[in-house]
Amino acid sequence: MSVNITQFNNYVAAGEFSVGVNTNENNNLLETITFVEEEHLTRLLGARLYNALQTDLAINNDGTATAQKWIDFINGVSYVDPSASDYTINYQGVFRMLKGFVFWQYISEHQYKRTSTGVRKLNAENSSMVDTQMTNALIRRKYNKSVDLYLCAQHFIDDYKTYEATASNIVESPATTYTVTISDTKYLANGDTVTIEGNEYTVANLVDDTSFEFTATTGLTFTDLTVSYEPFPDFKPVKPKYISFA
């Protein structure tokens, strides 16, 4: 079973994404959260990368990630645009995106509710045409805003499709074990594959922003100390579509 990032209370408490459920509807809302998150995150990431995210979320099993790349993916982060070093991107993460998609799905399936703060129309006889149009416009705006955030999340991952850093040295000691001294290991993890001078090696004994090791044939020397890797391998996104207001 998948681990959800957003939780039941995100939609029950008063606020932007409150759906106004009662205790008899709890299971319906939980089913919607699970369905929506799996569907949209799979489309956003691709199936293999979504499974990698789920593996990480399962460690704590409470919707919080452990690997820094997934923490930043979910919660957001400010980072320097790889294509323009003088420009900072303030990535907002996927938390609000998922809440918007869940809100839209749940409210649409149940033909609106969420009294006291606005959205209504459970009984069409008690809803004017204007009320219905305004409600439709509200939930469409929330959906389309989530599409905006979905595209931002894809842009974030695409910015880290390939990452490069320069090691200060690579030393063999003992034989067949190489230690790479490197001050930038952003989103690198043990077991990841790095490429050095066109050859691939598996990362072991990583010390963040300090060093890592790999094993290879003895006697190798390196002149180009560029280390490249893919923080989000198997990224195969599907582009979302906006809902028309026509």
Give the residues covered by each predicted segment.
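Conserved short "hinge" loops at termini or chain/domain junctions
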Residues: 1-95, 109-166, 177-181, 221-224, ...
